[in-house]
Amino acid sequence: MKRLWFIVGLFFCCISVQAEKRALIIGIGTYPDVDYGWPVIHGDNDIVFAKTMLVANGFKAGNIDTLRNEQASSHAIGEAFKRLIATAKTNDVVYIHFSGHGQQITDLDGDEEDGYDEAWVAYDALQEPTPNYHGEHHITDDQLNAWLKQLRQKVEINGRIIVVSDACHSGTSTRDITEPTEIRGAHSKFELNGIKRPYKEQRTIEWISISACADNECNRQHRLSDGKQCGSLTYALYLLRDNLSTIVADQLSALLNKTINELVKRPQTPLVELPNANNQYLFE
């Protein structure tokens, strides 16, 4: 009898640590008003494409958290990461997706060679400093790195973390009259004066990072047949959704490059940064 209960207990223990796929999708298209300095884009349209892509690759809808427009304040994004960290388990696959504006902001800890952090622009972030605003609502890569390190501790070495950024940190923030679609990003940097930065070693890569374009390029949106716009990176992943389970991670860059440049018809170089284990499948 004791042996039987031991086997039963072992069975339920194995079930309890079974790996799952979890995701957080953030999509911002409309920022509060013109005083915030951000023109309308269509990051909120990306949510349905990202979610469809994930479900096609084994993510349960109940394990996909979404924040749209006003739901995506800096506080709400932080709370969503806390929920993700709290529920993540050993060997889980965790996917994080941001579609919205991006901006370079003065680096405070010395880990960036050019002196600027890349930041996601939360719904309540301003484009320029004011006497009362110093970038508190920008989601800097330092903050993101802190959350991701906590996630890494939860999923451990064999877990998978994928971070997708369909934003732009160097593109113009206004509509280009020569382009049929808007461009995501801010032309101006968020400059904090009087900052002395300590030197800090650059971080090692502990997760798969996928960005829509190189730092010196613009992230152009794709116009759909119904006239709506969406992120070129998001839509490329959506188009590739049925193949992602069989794509080795280090093959993804070439496939995204080909797909995105067919969508936007202008040079745009998606970036895929990989940890050492780059010959594994993206979602497995």
Regions found by a protein language model. Give the residues of each.
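Residue-level detector of intrinsically disordered/flexible regions characterized by low predicted structural confidence
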Residues: 4-5, 163
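Hydrophobic h-region of N-terminal signal peptides that target proteins for export
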Residues: 5, 9-17
